[in-house]
């Protein structure tokens, strides 16, 4: 897994640019409806992305199709912030996040807990995207990780 923090049961998230989420949902339905644990739904708010969850060949997947280009989607931005933080750290952040993930926390709440980000962990991580590497290193150091 790309971040190296997967735990048993972690799914493979695939973020897709879907200019027409209905067409995306139709394609996903056509190809994966027979997969184990298949679920397909649309959010009722925002850009109303189409989300599919299923198990294929023993691997749990989540496909997320949104109107926005991938690099503008929150899931991708979270991934990029997490990747940057892990690259700036010598391994302590990865271990701390992995321990919380093993205890059942999802990825973003685990990062927020380790980094001392208050409030909504998803918004908190989004706020880090504009920070320079030096600021991220300082944040890691303040948490005893840098």
Region roles according to the model:
Residues 1-23:
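Active-site nucleotide-donor binding segment shared across nucleotidyl transfer reactions
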Residues 5-9, 42, 81:
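Solvent-exposed, flexible loop/coil residues
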Residues 16-57:
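Metal-dependent nucleotidyltransferase catalytic core
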Residues 60-67:
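A short acidic-to-branched-hydrophobic micro-motif
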Residues 69-146:
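Catalytic cores of NTP-dependent nucleotidyl/adenyl transfer enzymes across multiple folds
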């Amino acid at each position: 897994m790309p971040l190296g923090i997967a735990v048993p049961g972690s799914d493979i998230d695939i973020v897709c640019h879907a200019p027409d989420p209905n067409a995306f949902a139709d394609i996903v339905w056509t190809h994966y409806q027979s997969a184990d644990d298949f679920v397909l739904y649309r959010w009722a708010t925002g850009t109303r992305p189409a989300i599919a969850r299923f198990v294929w060949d023993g691997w749990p997947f989540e496909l997320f199709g949104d109107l926005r280009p991938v690099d503008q989607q929150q899931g991708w931005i979270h991934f990029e912030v997490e990747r940057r933080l892990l690259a700036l750290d010598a391994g302590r952040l990865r271990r701390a996040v992995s321990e919380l993930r093993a205890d059942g926390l999802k990825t973003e709440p685990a990062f927020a807990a380790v980094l001392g980000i208050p409030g909504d962990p998803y918004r908190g991580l989004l706020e880090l995207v504009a920070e320079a590497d030096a600021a991220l290193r300082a944040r890691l150091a303040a948490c005893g990780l840098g």
